[in-house]
């Protein structure tokens, strides 16, 4: 049985992590994120790409943006190794979008649409497990024990970039960069827009239906 290839788009706080985990559980796909792929390949030799540093980790350690050529190759390797995937955190610009379209066949592109003020509220109240990455919220989805992850018992913390000012900056940058990506896939006829301002279960109903429809 083949598994679907899903691209998940949405601003920070849109609920991509929650929906990605459910896609993994329901459809048996692999969750591929740019960050995880880069961290797993920190020491990969990239001298053949004719870039400044010899490994992806060198860019990360220097706090510099990893070039598209490097990110593209790392993502391609991760997708090639996956029997179905949900891709999150890539592509981030038009160049990466065109590259992705050239190396894989997407069954559906899901865009979680959430208003900016709602996103800010979600981000500033978000708490993340330092061990397993599970997310909770001070206003909704609270853990059973304050400060403790329900899933693994790890400690919960607030990310440094989850302040209101930083959250709005992140959202603005994301929307500026991703608007052309969304439009690209809309024109390709593979985009499914989902109202992300509802409960996770309600959002999931539409997410699962969109994947089922495109892979039937």
From Swiss-Prot:
Which pathway does the record list? Purine metabolism; AMP biosynthesis via salvage pathway; AMP from ADP: step 1/1
* Class of this enzyme: transferase
Protein's UniProt keywords contain Coiled coil: no
Q: Which Pfam families match?
A: ADK, ADK_lid
- Binding residue positions for Zn(2+): 129, 132, 149, 152
- Map out region (LID) in residue numbers: 125-162
What the entry lists under PROSITE patterns is as follows: ADENYLATE_KINASE
State if Lipid biosynthesis is listed as a keyword: no
Q: Which reaction does it catalyse?
A: AMP + ATP = 2 ADP
Q: Which residues bind ATP?
A: 13-18, 126, 135-136, 198
Q: State what this protein does.
A: Catalyzes the reversible transfer of the terminal phosphate group between ATP and AMP. Plays an important role in cellular energy homeostasis and in adenine nucleotide metabolism.
Q: Which HAMAP family match?
A: Adenylate_kinase_Adk
UniProt family annotation: Belongs to the adenylate kinase family.
Name assigned to this protein? Adenylate kinase
| Gene name as annotated | adk
